Amino acid sequence: MAVNDNPVPRGRIRRSMPLAGFTARAAGGRMVAALREKTGDAGAVTRFHERTAERYTELLGHSKGVLMKAGQVLSMVDASAIGNGGFSPYQKALARLQADAPPMDPALAKDVLQTDLGRPVREVFAEFSAEPMAAASIGQVHRAVLPDGREVAVKIQYPGAAQAIRDDLANTELLATFFRFVVSASGTAMQPDFRQMTREIGARIAEEIDYRHEAANITAFSELYRGHPFIRVPDVIAEASGDRVLTMTYLDGLDWTAAQRADQELKNTWAEVIGRFSAGSYRHANLFNADPHPGNYRFGLDGTVGFVDFGCVKVLPERVRLKFIEMIRATIDGRKYDLHDRMAELGYFAGGSTLSADEAYEWMAGLAYEALAPQPITFTRDTAERAVRGLIDLRSPDHPVRRVSAPDDMVFFTRLSLMLNPIYAMLGATCYVRSIIDDLDGAAEPTTPLGKQHDAWV
């Protein structure tokens, strides 16, 4: 495994120039490729995108900051469903960022750990693996054993990553430039509110560099789900955690690659667990985990799922939480005027939208297709593609997204839908979506085995 012992580039200008320069060169290269294809060089544009995608991914992989995190999010979206599919080569290349981020040199990781905790590694851990078990956008994870014998996972932040992200976020054009590149490559006509998008996404990413904040998030979720029959959340080891080091109890289980080789019945169970965790956390409390990607799960052969990353968590205001659930129920129950009222109260029509109750219901019912269609539902690539087109594919000038203003509190719900559907599809999961939602909302008695287990636990 290649290691990285270079410091993260710091400063607005130093971190903006590579992206801006690359984007400009890519635009020129795309024009040249298009001309070559017109003069008989078949596939010139496709080859250009494939080459450029590799270079773009390498650039993001070394950024250790906001851009790499944004790249990870996009890696989970079915880019072939966006616009003319031009972003698809980039999506495939970005997928490597989920598990192939260049790790730190072991000596550097050890230095960060000892400096942050103020003690030698041997005093904190009885055993510590120098080789990381995972490397992500702003840190990497090592296995270790505490003096009392408990197995733990130790997350160590890359040196300079926190300041680099702060510099990124201070430069409001950086994320906007990235998303403009995505829009351009995908061939859509969309013109989203980049300012609003970067504001809310930036706020969550800023929280991810604060390991003490993540520790508090983990504690909130572990207390919510302590003793749960199929949802597993680690406990924070406070005495082995600090500003740049976060230690938590180790959750065993299959990784994503191994999980996909499991029996289909087990994969169906895992998908339902993920769905119940994702939708249940803001129904049972006001917590919303906004980072649902495969590397964050540990799949148990007993049907349980462990959730290990809580850096990106949205705490919903109670009014917003209740209105959002009411909006979902109005959609499920076919109450289009109630739906329109809840959307208005949440701020979807703040810009003076003329979207009618009928149009709003048609749009939201399309987004809730899996709950409204004949049950059970088997998730496929078409399912994930439908979600993308319903939420962000703006080729039509009359698309509802062009006529509403998504409130800040709702931005990450879009991310949840875009990222969960591909996960379910890759598991090939078959689920009774409607009964699960009705059960979570208290609109009906649980019918699935997991629903009955949860009901008994509550």
What do the predicted segments below correspond to?
Residues 1-279, 286, 300-304, 310-318, ...:
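Broad phosphate/nucleotide-binding scaffolds in NTP-utilizing and phosphate-metabolizing enzymes
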Residues 284-294:
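Catalytic-loop of the protein kinase fold
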Residues 295-299:
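Hydrophobic residue at the +6 position relative to the catalytic HRD Asp in the kinase catalytic loop
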